[in-house]
């Protein structure tokens, strides 16, 4: 088992928005090929896992079938004006029963939990690059070898809370996503429990509220920018949301280094 501890190193960005953003971009561009592999694996696995789980959870399969029926009717009608789009939106909303909402929360939580170790991998690769250490393809899967159970638990709990929050009110879900933003690096680098990662992330995020909020918003905007390029661009911009986590974490907590247990 590898552990990590905190030290102050020159590679650690200052607790300033510009410094952290520059640090994140440097890591992102330096690990781009690994990030591209990561996002392909992540998105494929996410849609496969989430799709399969939705059919096995009560209410999920019926909703998927209803969505497919509504979308087929929309395409066959060949009416793409504002009224048709509004009608489509209303039909999809009508199909979202309470059972469907619960099934989505469960399926997305399980999917995110299973993929959380992969997210840790891209965070760890950012660390390796930043520390001028050799990066290997196997580093992408380190989350499946170290503190895996707690990483998975963290992924499940936080996603369940975020998804439930989004169902209640979008602002609640967004706030929870923001509050949990650096919890995963904490669980991994500090080899701690999921609950401790949640607690410490809340504490540190609120202690550095404005800085983290601005960076969280910018990371989200940059990661979503690929949608403007026929969706394909998401493959190139999506990983930035995850590499930014390491930069924010290292600015607040100090850059970790590997030690023997």
Please state what every model-predicted region is.
Residues 71-86, 186, 190-211, 250-261:
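Alpha-helical transmembrane segments and their immediate juxtamembrane interface regions
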Residues 11, 147, 168-170:
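Short, charged helix-to-loop "capping" segments that act as catalytic/coupling loops
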Residues 14-45, 137-164, 178-227:
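Interfacial aromatic "cap" segments that immediately flank transmembrane helices
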Residues 1-23, 255-261:
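Low-complexity, intrinsically disordered extramembrane tails and loops of integral membrane proteins
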Residues 2-4, 97-131, 159-195, 223, ...:
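Selective recognition of hydrophobic, aromatic-rich stretches within alpha-helical transmembrane segments
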Residues 14-127, 131, 150:
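Short, small/hydrophobic-residue-rich motifs at membrane-helix boundaries and re-entrant hairpins
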Residues 47-54, 62, 66, 148, ...:
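Alpha-helix boundary/capping detector
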């Amino acid at each position: 088992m590898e552990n990590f501890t905190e030290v102050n190193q020159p590679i650690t960005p200052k607790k300033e928005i510009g410094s952290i953003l520059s640090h994140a971009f440097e890591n992102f561009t330096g690990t781009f090929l690994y990030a591209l592999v990561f996002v392909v694996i992540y998105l494929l696995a996410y849609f496969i896992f989430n799709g399969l789980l939705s059919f096995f959870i009560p209410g999920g399969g019926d909703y998927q079938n209803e969505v497919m029926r509504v979308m087929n009717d929309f395409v066959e009608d060949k009416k793409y004006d504002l009224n048709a789009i509004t009608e489509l939106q209303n039909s999809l909303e009508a199909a979202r029963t309470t059972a469907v909402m619960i099934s989505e929360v469960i399926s997305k939580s399980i999917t995110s939990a299973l993929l959380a170790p992969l997210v840790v991998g891209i965070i760890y690769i950012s660390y390796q690059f930043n520390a001028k250490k050799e990066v290997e393809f196997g580093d992408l899967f380190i989350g499946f070898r170290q503190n895996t159970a707690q990483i998975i638990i963290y992924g499940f709990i936080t996603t369940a809370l975020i998804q439930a929050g989004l169902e209640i009110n979008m602002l609640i879900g967004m706030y929870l996503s923001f509050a949990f933003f650096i919890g995963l690096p904490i669980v991994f680098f500090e080899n701690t429990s999921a609950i401790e990662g949640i607690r410490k992330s809340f504490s540190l995020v609120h202690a550095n509220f404005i800085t983290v909020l601005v960076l969280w918003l910018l990371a989200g905007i940059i990661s979503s920018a690929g949608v403007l390029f026929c969706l394909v661009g998401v493959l190139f911009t999506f990983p930035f949301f995850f590499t930014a986590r390491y930069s924010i974490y290292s600015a607040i907590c100090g850059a970790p280094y590997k030690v023997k247990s």
